[in-house]
Amino acid sequence: MDVNPTLLFLKVPAQNAISTTFPYTGDPPYSHGTGTGYTMDTVNRTHQYSEKGKWATNTETGAPQLNPIDGPLPEDNEPSGYAQTDCVLEAMAFLEESHPGIFENSCLETMEVVQQTRVDKLTQGRQTYDWTLNRNQPAATALANTIEVFRSNGLTANESGRLIDFLKDVMESMDKEEMEITTHFQRKRRVRDNMTKKMVTQRTIGKKKQRLNKRSYLIRALTLNTMTKDAERGKLKRRAIATPGMQIRGFVYFVETLARSICEKLEQSGLPVGGNEKKAKLANVVRKMMTNSQDTELSFTITGDNTKWNENQNPRMFLAMITYITRNQPEWFRNVLSIAPIMFSNKMARLGKGYMFESKSMKLRTQIPAEMLANIDLKYFNESTRKKIEKIRPLLIDGTASLSPGMMMGMFNMLSTVLGVSILNLGQKRYTKTTYWWDGLQSSDDFALIVNAPNHEGIQAGVDRFYRTCKLVGINMSKKKSYINRTGTFEFTSFFYRYGFVANFSMELPSFGVSGINESADMSIGVTVIKNNMINNDLGPATAQMALQLFIKDYRYTYRCHRGDTQIQTRRSFELKKLWEQTRSKAGLLVSDGGPNLYNIRNLHIPEVCLKWELMDEDYQGRICNPLNPFVSHKEIESVNNAVVMPAHGPAKSMEYDAVATTHSWIPKRNRSILNTSQRGILEDEQMYQKCCSLFEKFFPSSSYRRPVGISSMVEAMVSRARIDARIDFESGRIKKEEFAEIMKICSTIEELRRQK
């Protein structure tokens, strides 16, 4: 049957048709091999944008550094990083004038955070550059290694468990003449296997001590490791992203806390809120501009794009901003906040793995590590790579490149948003002192600019003024990639606005389907995605019902759990049929056990086990919720878990779903092969570290408690807490005298063991 496609749209407003333009089917592109080339591109580009700056040499590390601040004013439209300090400070002053007390209040909020944050804040986050091993590690391990090295070098402030005290150690470590670290290495040897009598390679792991002098340590402390950004759609070329080490992380966290607190108070800021809250905030700004432009004024909106936002930003500018924002605050607070930008002014970019060479004729492959690029003969490289290496050579030290200007991706998102908003703020009539005025939205490097004026010339003049003002603080609006429209139609951070934000449901399509975690989580995530899209993305009831049926079908095929009375034959059908036949209340069987689906769009918020609990046979209940089931390695399931869902565009989102622990919440065992590598010791450290952290959280459920005065370690804090809790429980009759005595005895034993150690 032929369908005329235009018929589909007869009743649909044009803006709703956006979901039909969905380009992102299939998998996004991933990068393979080394990111060295991309990192060199970033370093070279950043220096090119600031090339008219002044060169200097860092006295501690010997690194050549380029400082473009207060450089020549631009004479053309090329992107440049020559921010003018006085312009940035003036923009900050005007921002404060329009929002009285904003900086003061944010500083007070941040000061409180600084004093309360525990060092385990740094265990959040994924891959982190571990300076002790000179490669990436999970955040928790990198932190543990850093603290271990600090302690063995006599730096012990961190034992209090406060982040600020850990940072004191970081500062002290930079003054030390040398640091001793422990590195892992591998020995391989050939031995005969007793069973098979074949020769096998046996790997043993060794740890060795290594001393770093001040210069080498500083280089590592200031290093950002680089990787290639994966899964970026709509780009031909990959690009590099950076991951900083533990010395920088804590300082950045406090700066971003301050900036976040400021952004929350700025109506033009698209950060730190998200989702519907963000849409509401942005819709307000648009409404304000449209209301004011009544009949007399024209109103136009630019969907903006900035050229190489973070390569033209400069840490020295951020230092100036922080100095201004905190100007009436206590000295210690100003110092803590100024360290991050200072470290970034002296940062080093690690070039990654280096290059891989193959000789077709001799079937040889060899890796040229980044450290060798400084003095290898360039005749082996193709022309473009040769140019890159020649350009970067003066900047190289120990396989890292000195990169003073520029910010690297995703480091100071909040603070750079404050800078962007401060320019939007200058669009008020009392500052432009003319007939045009502007306002807009800023979220990291993405912006939308709304300009109002009595006529087209005024609009043009307003845009020009905005463009030039941005140039003065190192923001380069791209004239090629920005476009202007009558206000009412624009795009901002992948939200499309047409007389209101349009739900672009198709963006969420990749997150529909079976996640592949386990039967319990997958069911829960699947229905939650549908529920969330009904709430946030105009997913209508009929479509949602269809999505649900498709999901259940998909789920049954994935886990081979077709209904017990079906004709479909799979590996599991024999067992499932048997279960079906011996179950009295068949409606109580979970879908993953061959039961019927009881979900409809009204009850998506209820976990399946709860939905069917009353319908289950008693022995089936006992089987589903059985903590002693030997086949399920149970992690303790919180009532809410987080799943990572991939929308088509933008970063992976974290989504909460209800998690009910059943025998279907299994966790696949870890691949054994890791246990024979140098990672093994690291893995054991990591597990021990996680056990300690979760134990600690049992004692202090909020894990952000105010520290009891005079207590120096986690163990002592837990013992003292255990004693207090036991006494309260004993006096209120919740525990017996014998139990109370036993707890006290255990506490004393622990203290005794600590003293002996």
Curated annotation (Swiss-Prot):
* Primary enzyme class: transferase
Q: Name one GO cellular component term.
A: host cell cytoplasm
Domain named RdRp catalytic: residues: 286-483
Gene Ontology biological process terms in this record: DNA-templated transcription; symbiont-mediated suppression of host gene expression; symbiont-mediated suppression of host mRNA transcription via inhibition of RNA polymerase II activity; viral RNA genome replication; viral transcription
**Where's it mainly located?**
host cell
Q: Name one GO molecular function term.
A: nucleotide binding
Per the entry, what this protein does is:
RNA-dependent RNA polymerase which is responsible for replication and transcription of virus RNA segments. The transcription of viral mRNAs occurs by a unique mechanism called cap-snatching. 5' methylated caps of cellular mRNAs are cleaved after 10-13 nucleotides by PA. In turn, these short capped RNAs are used as primers by PB1 for transcription of viral mRNAs. During virus replication, PB1 initiates RNA synthesis and copy vRNA into complementary RNA (cRNA) which in turn serves as a template for the production of more vRNAs.
Superkingdom per UniProt: Viruses
Instruction: Please identify the protein, giving its name as recorded.
Output: RNA-directed RNA polymerase catalytic subunit
Q: How does it assemble?
A: Influenza RNA polymerase is composed of three subunits: PB1, PB2 and PA. Interacts (via N-terminus) with PA (via C-terminus). Interacts (via C-terminus) with PB2 (via N-terminus); this interaction is essential for transcription initiation.
Q: To which protein family does this belong?
A: Belongs to the influenza viruses polymerase PB1 family.
State the residue spans of region: Disordered: 53-82
* Region feature (Promoter-binding site): 249-256
Q: Describe its PTM? A: Phosphorylated by host PRKCA.
Q: Where in the cell is it found?
A: Host nucleus; Host cytoplasm
The keyword Ligase belongs to this UniProt entry's keyword annotation: no
Enumerate the catalysed reactions.
Answer: RNA(n) + a ribonucleoside 5'-triphosphate = RNA(n+1) + diphosphate
Q: What EC number(s) would the UniProt record show?
A: 2.7.7.48
